[in-house]
């Protein structure tokens, strides 16, 4: 069966933004206009289609990225838009990160009142990292304090982008009644409540001068990206709508310009024009560079490793990337994946090249938030879900077994907060283990491990809300009741000076003994660099087959910690010498020798504890500024900058996570509920010595 929609007419887009900018509402409106839903869903009523987990409907936020397919017709031509709705809450950045990896373009939604908020900056940086072309939608134009020009200015200043407004609002706040389309130079007024009826009208005289200025600026910005248009423009020629659209599309895909639109999704204003803009300016799978990868077992960037490219075409061998695992109450495990090349039919086999496992494709589904449609095959450019994968996890490559390739995986931040959790009853015990392992499969930033010293089960994640949602899902979806401890900071250990160690593990009991001997040089790496292992053995003083055991021993010792039982990070370990015994040496002996060696090296290397520091943004009325600043200082924080926003002050600061637990509640009571704050992980920094001493003593009991 040939594909229904040609590749050029497919758009894989994400709707990304700060929490509460109105992203899910915008997606809901898109689904309504593209005929996928017949009744409008509202987040604040708890009926939004894309928010299908109970927690999302209760909290009014989006936690998981639901993928859905919609159809939209522009000038008589049908297009298919695959939409991924992503969460805006900072505790769920993993969801945003993994969606961006498989998208071709993004719609970034801003709140016209608040403008660019901290999470908008985070999301923007994530989109930059994956070179995702984007358009901006300034939402909530009907709210008191809405300001389109200020938001555009903030996009320019705080995000360092080159925004080009291609629309201008007619009226704002409760008088927002339409937009001027600067490309066609026509006014569009909304006549009915559902925004389905538009009337074209003359541009209102009170904004005519402003519109003319903005239109000229827009034409100039577009012409600057295209030499042919620049010549026509300089010669005073009138540029046609087609020429402007074509050049703006090119510039958007290259990342030179960012078109900006406006509207009020909740009032159904501006969403159809946004759909047109998705088609006009965002790339199809054909417009982006072909995906690149390596052969299994090779590492990109190593000497002599050639990169393989896969063209976006169904004639190429099949290549896909799994970007999300979901435990579905009806069909079990679902793996969402993006097809980069080739095609895939149900009943066929693929190779999971990341894990070197074959996987049979049972059923394929195309998703519409939470109802699904069975399909027989998927093609290059599609996003679909397979049912019941045995071996595939987030970030894995699936490909044609006869032509294997491994794509770059998705990298996720390490968890910064942890808490102990225990089942309430004996019956909950086994159920809890199953629930936690399923939840960890779905979410790569959520970890579960057992504390070696206390035997407690510890869960770790990106923030208090993240862990709260996990415990909540355990209760609802898996019917597990659990008691939880207080949130704890996920400290790390590291060293400050290099250390050399000579470590021997020898055991002689009757019969075969044990013998492992390694010499290690251990050096500190800069923050965030993780772990590097270098094998510098020459002349076979340690046989090659024991080297992986040495690395495993080092990693094991690092994971369990040395001075206070926290994982050791940012180390470079070089194995440069050692010896072995013909009979007594074994992998186990070398593993133990390496593990003992690493622990000794950390003790010698002037060890320190590292603590996570959060980037905090607080919006407070002027009257409480002194109180809020004093409070930040008392929490060992330092203020990086302040700016006025309307009659409020915005404070940006860095504060250690250890002193931020329950901060939102404290802030509310200190400011009579008038200040708001948001925070996200920034970096790890050394803990002051007195505090470190206290923690080490406490851990050692």
From Swiss-Prot:
What does the UniProt entry say about where the protein is found? Cytoplasm
Swiss-Prot/TrEMBL keywords? Cytoplasm, Elongation factor, GTP-binding, Nucleotide-binding, Protein biosynthesis
Recorded hits in InterPro entries, A to Z, give: EF-G-like_DII (IPR053905), EFG_II (IPR041095), EFG_III (IPR009022), EFG_III/V (IPR035647), EFG_IV (IPR047872), EFG_V (IPR035649), EFG_V-like (IPR000640), G_TR_CS (IPR031157)
Q: Which SMART domains match?
A: EFG_C, EFG_IV
Binding annotation for GTP:
17-24, 85-89, 139-142
Single GO molecular function: GTP binding
**Domain tr-type G: residue ranges:** 8-286
Q: What is its main location?
A: cytoplasm
GO biological-process terms attached to the record: ribosome disassembly
Quote the CDD domains the UniProt record gives.
EF-G, EFG_III, EFG_mtEFG1_IV, EFG_mtEFG_C, EFG_mtEFG_II
Name one cellular component (GO) term: cytoplasm
Write down the Pfam families for this protein, in alphabetical order.
EF-G_D2, EFG_C, EFG_III, EFG_IV, GTP_EFTU
Report if keyword Heme is assigned.
no
Q: Which residues cross the membrane?
A: none
Mind telling me which HAMAP family this protein's record contains?
A: EF_G_EF_2_B (MF_00054_B)
The free-text function statement in the UniProt record for this protein reads: Catalyzes the GTP-dependent ribosomal translocation step during translation elongation. During this step, the ribosome changes from the pre-translocational (PRE) to the post-translocational (POST) state as the newly formed A-site-bound peptidyl-tRNA and P-site-bound deacylated tRNA move to the P and E sites, respectively. Catalyzes the coordinated movement of the two tRNA molecules, the mRNA and conformational changes in the ribosome.
Q: What family is this?
A: Belongs to the TRAFAC class translation factor GTPase superfamily. Classic translation factor GTPase family. EF-G/EF-2 subfamily.
Protein name (record): Elongation factor G
The species this protein was found in = Roseiflexus sp. (strain RS-1)
């Amino acid at each position: 069966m040939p594909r229904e929609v040609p590749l050029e007419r497919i758009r894989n887009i994400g709707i990304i933004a700060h929490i509460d900018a109105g992203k899910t509402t915008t997606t809901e409106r898109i689904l309504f206009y593209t005929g996928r839903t017949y009744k409008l869903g509202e987040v604040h009523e708890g009926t939004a289609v894309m928010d299908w987990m109970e927690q999302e409907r209760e909290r009014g936020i989006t936690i998981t990225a639901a993928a859905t397919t919609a159809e939209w017709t522009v000038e008589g031509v049908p297009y298919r838009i695959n939409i991924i709705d992503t969460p805006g809450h900072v505790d769920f950045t993993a969801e945003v990160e993994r969606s961006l990896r498989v998208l071709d373009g993004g719609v970034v939604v801003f709140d016209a009142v608040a403008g660019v908020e901290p999470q908008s900056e985070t999301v923007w940086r994530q989109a930059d990292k994956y070179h995702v072309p984007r358009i901006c939608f300034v939402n909530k134009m009907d709210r008191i304090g809405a300001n389109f020009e200020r938001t555009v200015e903030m996009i320019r200043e705080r995000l360092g982008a080159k925004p080009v407004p291609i629309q201008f609002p007619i009226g704002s706040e409760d008088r927002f009644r339409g937009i001027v389309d600067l490309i066609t130079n026509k006014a569009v007024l909304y006549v009915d409540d559902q925004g389905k009826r538009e009337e074209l009208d003359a541009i209102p005289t009170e904004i005519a001068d402003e519109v003319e200025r903005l239109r000229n600026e827009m034409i100039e910005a577009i012409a600057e990206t295209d030499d042919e248009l620049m010549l026509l423009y300089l010669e005073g020629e009138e540029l046609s709508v087609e020429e402007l659209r074509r050049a703006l599309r090119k510039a958007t895909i290259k990342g030179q310009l960012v078109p900006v639109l406006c509207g009020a999704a909740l009032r159904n204003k501006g969403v159809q024009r946004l759909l047109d803009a998705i088609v006009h300016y965002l790339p199809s799978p054909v417009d982006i560079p072909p995906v690149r990868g390596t052969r299994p077992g090779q590492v990109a960037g190593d000497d002599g490793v050639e990169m393989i490219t896969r063209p976006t075409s169904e004639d190429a061998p099949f290549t896909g990337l799994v970007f999300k695992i979901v435990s579905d109450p009806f069909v079990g495990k679902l793996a969402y994946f993006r097809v980069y090349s080739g095609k895939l039919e149900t009943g066929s086999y693929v190779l999971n090249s990341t894990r070197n496992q074959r996987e049979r494709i049972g059923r394929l589904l195309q998703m519409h938030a939470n109802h699904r449609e069975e399909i027989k095959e998927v093609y290059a450019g599609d996003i679909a879900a397979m049912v019941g994968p045995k071996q595939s996890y987030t970030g894995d490559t699936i490909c044609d077994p006869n032509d294997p390739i491994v794509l770059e995986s998705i990298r996720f931040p390490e968890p910064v907060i942890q808490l102990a959790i225990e089942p309430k009853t004996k019956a909950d015990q086994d159920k809890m283990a199953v629930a936690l392992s399923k939840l960890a499969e779905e979410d790569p930033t959520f970890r579960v491990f057992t504390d070696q010293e206390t035997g407690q089960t510890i869960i770790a994640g990106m923030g208090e809300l993240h862990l709260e949602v996990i415990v909540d899902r355990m209760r609802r979806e898996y019917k597990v009741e659990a008691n939880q401890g207080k949130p704890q900071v996920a400290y790390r250990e590291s060293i400050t000076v290099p250390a050399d160690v000579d470590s021997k593990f020898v055991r002689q009991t009757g019969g075969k003994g044990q013998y492992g001997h390694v010499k290690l040089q251990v050096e500190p790496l800069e923050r965030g660099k993780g772990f590097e292992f270098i094998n510098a053995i020459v002349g076979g003083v340690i046989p090659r087959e024991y080297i992986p055991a040495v690395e495993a021993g080092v990693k094991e010792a690092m994971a369990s910690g040395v001075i206070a039982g926290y994982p050791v990070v940012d180390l470079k370990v070089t194995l440069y010498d050692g010896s072995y015994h013909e009979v007594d040496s074994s992998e186990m002996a070398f593993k133990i020798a390496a593990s003992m060696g690493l622990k000794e090296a950390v003790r010698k290397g002037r060890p320190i504890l590292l603590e996570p520091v959060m980037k905090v943004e607080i919006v407070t009325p002027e009257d409480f500024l002194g109180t809020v600043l004093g409070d930040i200082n008392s929490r060992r924080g330092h203020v990086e900058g302040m700016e006025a926003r309307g009659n409020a002050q915005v404070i940006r600061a860095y504060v250690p996570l250890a002193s931020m637990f329950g901060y939102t509640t404290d802030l509310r009571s200190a400011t009579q509920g008038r200040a708001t704050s948001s925070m996200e992980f920034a970096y790890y920094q050394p803990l002051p010595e007195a505090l470190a001493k206290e923690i080490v003593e406490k851990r050692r009991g």
